[in-house]
């Protein structure tokens, strides 16, 4: 089956938001729980929804913690977000070649739009599924299924690209092929354990992979 659709995670995949996310967590946690959390303590928080993460910390303050996190995140967004090499050129080429491209993210839409605008990727994506659009987040298949439906695409004709196990398992649950990115903050071996179909060392690796898949 040939691939005609590519779905991307956003944070840590298309744009480098690692420092923004870590700083947002540390600011929030230091505000409410001084001197209890270090940088390495918040790395596992990258990937799950804010609600899931903060529920495990303090169920009585979830909404308060989310509000604090998002305020810091918005205020420092543009200074802390960076680009990944070859991302813009690769997505541009995928569109040029006629691929359907979409984003499936656990972020809120407002912050997603900020990131896409800053990285100039906003012109390429017709479909962006955020946490605001679904009841269940990755690795549940719902977000991917929604994106595929909006793109009029079939799972077996799609590839999910991401930096976290939520993306890889989410793709597997939805029936797509999967590609993990080796630049994940959690390390290459972490993602290899989830057996993605492909491992990308840079985003442009996607182009020959898709070419080979569609040649067979």
Swiss-Prot record:
GO terms for biological process: DNA repair. The keyword Hydrolase applies. Hydrolyzes pyrophosphate formed during P-Ser-HPr dephosphorylation by HPrK/P. Might play a role in controlling the intracellular pyrophosphate pool. Its cofactor is Mg(2+). The keyword Translocase does not apply. GO terms for molecular function: inorganic diphosphate phosphatase activity; magnesium ion binding; phosphoglycolate phosphatase activity. The active site is at 9 (nucleophile). It catalyses: diphosphate + H2O = 2 phosphate + H(+). This is Pyrophosphatase PpaX. GO terms for cellular component: cytosol. It holds the Pfam family HAD_2. It comes from Bacillus thuringiensis (strain Al Hakam). Its EC number is 3.6.1.1. Keywords: Hydrolase, Magnesium. CDD domains: HAD_PPase. Belongs to the HAD-like hydrolase superfamily. PpaX family.
């Amino acid at each position: 089956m040939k691939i005609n659709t590519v779905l991307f995670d956003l944070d840590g995949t298309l744009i480098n938001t690692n420092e923004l996310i870590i700083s947002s967590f540390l600011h929030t946690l230091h505000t409410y729980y001084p001197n209890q959390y270090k940088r390495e303590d918040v790395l596992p928080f990258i990937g799950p929804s804010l609600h899931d993460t903060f529920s495990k910390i303090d169920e009585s303050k979830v909404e308060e913690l989310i509000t604090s996190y998002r305020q810091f995140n918005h205020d420092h967004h543009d200074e802390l977000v960076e680009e990944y090499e070859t991302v813009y050129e690769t997505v541009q080429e995928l569109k040029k070649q006629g691929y359907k491209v979409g984003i499936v993210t656990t972020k809120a839409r407002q912050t997603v739009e900020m990131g896409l605008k800053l990285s100039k990727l906003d012109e390429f994506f017709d479909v962006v599924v955020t946490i605001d659009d679904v009841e269940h987040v990755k690795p549940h298949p719902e977000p991917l299924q929604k994106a595929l439906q909006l793109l009029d695409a079939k799972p077996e004709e799609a590839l999910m690209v991401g930096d976290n196990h939520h993306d890889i398992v989410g793709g597997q649950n939805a029936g797509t092929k999967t590609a993990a990115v080796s630049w994940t903050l959690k390390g290459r071996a972490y993602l290899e354990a989830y057996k993605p179909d492909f491992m990308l060392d840079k985003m442009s690796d996607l182009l020959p992979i898709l070419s080979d898949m569609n040649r067979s």
